[in-house]
Design a protein with these regions (language model features):
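N-terminal "arm"/small-domain region of PLP-dependent enzymes with the aminotransferase-like
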Residues: 1-29
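Short beta->alpha connector loops at strand-helix junctions that form conserved
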Residues: 81, 100-104
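Active-site phosphate-binding strand-loop segment of PLP-dependent enzymes
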Residues: 106-169
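Phosphate-binding glycine-rich loop
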Residues: 29-76, 90-94, 100, 123-133
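Conserved coil-to-alpha-helix start sites within the AMP-binding
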Residues: 83-88
Length: 169
């Protein structure tokens, strides 16, 4: 007997096929077209920001986010221990160093351990979190919501504000 346990189950409830067919008919199935523009406009409105940029993958979105956070070679970025490599690769693209943070029972980053790391292994100099042992700047924390479980963003955002970290979600 063969049993298959899916990693995730697609959830299609509306006009997805209609929209995909329409995009194909218009010849826009990648980086442009009306649907991309509409997505960017709706996301900007939802987020209350002037502009957003749709990306072709989560990896490229994370890479652009690290650039926006001014992550430089030699900097550090906190990442969860349980994630796909695509969440860590962009850190290496910037020649930065990932700092792996353990997860809690939700399988997402543990804010208790994040706070303990910031308190015990780091210090703040001129509104910049510094890893005490290495002297390296910690510029950001990448939060990944795993398998439909939501990370405790309220706690993580509080920690990030206190320790001057940018949050990439």
């Amino acid at each position: 007997m063969s049993r298959f346990i899916p990693l995730s189950i697609p959830n299609f409830e509306g006009n997805e096929r209609k929209y995909v067919d329409d995009a194909i008919d218009q010849g826009w199935v990648s980086t442009g077209g009306a649907y991309i523009t509409k997505l960017e406009e709706q996301m900007a409105g939802f987020l209350h920001v002037e502009k957003v940029a749709a990306c072709q993958s989560g990896t490229s979105a994370l890479h652009l986010s690290l650039l926006e956070c001014n992550v430089q070679p030699g900097d550090m970025v906190i990442v969860p221990t349980l994630t796909f490599i695509a969440a860590v690769n962009p850190v290496h693209y910037q020649f930065a160093e990932p700092v792996f943070m353990d997860c809690d029972d939700s399988l997402c980053m543990d804010p208790v351990k994040l706070r303990k790391f910031c308190e015990k292994e780091c210090h703040v100099e001129q509104k910049q979190l510094i890893h005490t042992a290495s002297g390296k700047k910690i510029k950001a924390v990448i939060v990944v919501h795993v398998f439909g479980n939501l990370a405790d963003m309220e706690s993580i955002m509080d920690i990030a504000e206190e320790y001057h970290l940018k949050v990439i979600e």
